[in-house]
């Protein structure tokens, strides 16, 4: 069973075993508008929790995507590099950014669950 957690910077992480899939939330892609460019890290790169993991550019702004957890990049979503609009179309699914081999599962405890994140987003509106 996978478990999904959220940051206050609107990144999500879905964990399945020791693999963490990371992307941006629907709220984030709505705020960005039409995504026109995505820059992803190289496979094999070690990323610490809170470090820049990717860059996403939209018609409105460029924004860094920070990793919610630490680990080694084991896969990147080349589909969204080729077709960045995939982030807008399915941010929480096929629009994922990177997959990491999770270094420290306890980092997940610092992140919000879905209910807490929903409350957080409501507080912003």
From Swiss-Prot:
InterPro entries: 2-oxoA_DH_lipoyl-BS, Biotin_lipoyl, GCV_H, GCV_H/Fam206, GCV_H_sub, Single_hybrid_motif
Cofactor(s) required, per the database record: (R)-lipoate
PROSITE patterns registered for this protein in UniProt: BIOTINYL_LIPOYL, LIPOYL
Modification sites for N6-lipoyllysine: 60
Subunit annotation: The glycine cleavage system is composed of four proteins: P, T, L and H.
Function, in words: The glycine cleavage system catalyzes the degradation of glycine. The H protein shuttles the methylamine group of glycine from the P protein to the T protein.
Protein name: Glycine cleavage system H protein
